Amino acid sequence: MAPANLPSIFNATSQDIEQLLAAQCHIGSKNLGVHAQPYLWKTRADGVNIINIGKTWEKIVLAARIIAAIDNPSDVCVISARPYGQRAVLKFAAHTGAQAIAGRFTPGSFTNYITRSFKEPRLIVVTDPRTDAQAIKEASYVNIPVIALCDTDSPTEYVDVAIPTNNKGRHSIGLVWWMLAREVLRLRGTIYNREAPWDVMVDLYFYRDPEAEAEEKVEEEKLPGVDEEGVAAIESGFPAAGGDWEAAPAAFPAAGAATGEWSEAQGAQWETGTGAPAADWAAEPAKESSW
């Protein structure tokens, strides 16, 4: 399945083909659109269409050459309303300098200049033509070219360059975006040697469940020995503070030696009434008010 319509410098390596197969980029859907027939390899017995990986690589290189031809990287807008592609477009934008719209696309972002999210890109790249239909529709109004990751059943209306791949799996979406970013950087000269591997791992482009990340963070923040039992948990999780717990406390000084016995009265006993006599409130006549 090696591509034959590219210069030899752009040919895919065996590792690239293995990665595309491992990420199941060749697994299409059971429905087949008329525009996806040239990219079909075969149809399995269960009705699932298999995509030609060689055609996928050709379109990845073609899309990368189009993106690299734009002088200002920020004039490229990458869009993904599908959750599996949101992390990928953010990483692609961080590595190539493009603008990213991850999540819901605000209607009017390309046509209504009054909105805060108004943009005027020269090229947009979408993850799924079906979920990103609003962005493609607005791009057609203002003559913006569209590159899209298309499955065998994806609509291709107003799509200028379709990359045939599985756009429903988290690994296939992340791998295609990773390869697209790598080819763009190679064409720009950021990666000088095409034989050397890119130092960015493809795992960074894969979707990660926020709940799973939160659970991993909680596990990392746990103190050592919390889940253990017995003396070992106390020794490992609660180290000694440095003092001796069995040491006897210091004795308080005898109060009688310094101040005398408590039973002895200093001066006179308070029971004898030596203090000032209490005034008799009843003996005093009530003062008449002038009111």
From Swiss-Prot:
Residues 255-291 are annotated as: Disordered. The keyword Cytoplasm applies. CDD domains: RPS2. This is Small ribosomal subunit protein uS2. Belongs to the universal ribosomal protein uS2 family. Required for the assembly and/or stability of the 40S ribosomal subunit. Required for the processing of the 20S rRNA-precursor to mature 18S rRNA in a late step of the maturation of 40S ribosomal subunits. InterPro entries: Ribosomal_uS2, Ribosomal_uS2_CS, Ribosomal_uS2_euk, Ribosomal_uS2_euk/arc, Ribosomal_uS2_flav_dom_sf. It is found in: Cytoplasm. Component of the small ribosomal subunit. Mature ribosomes consist of a small (40S) and a large (60S) subunit. The 40S subunit contains about 33 different proteins and 1 molecule of RNA (18S). The 60S subunit contains about 49 different proteins and 3 molecules of RNA (25S, 5.8S and 5S). Interacts with RPS21. The keyword Ribonucleoprotein applies. SUPFAM superfamilies: Ribosomal protein S2. GO terms for molecular function: structural constituent of ribosome. One of its GO terms (cellular component) is cytosolic small ribosomal subunit. One of its GO terms (biological process) is translation. Keywords: Cytoplasm, Ribonucleoprotein, Ribosomal protein. The gene is RPS0.
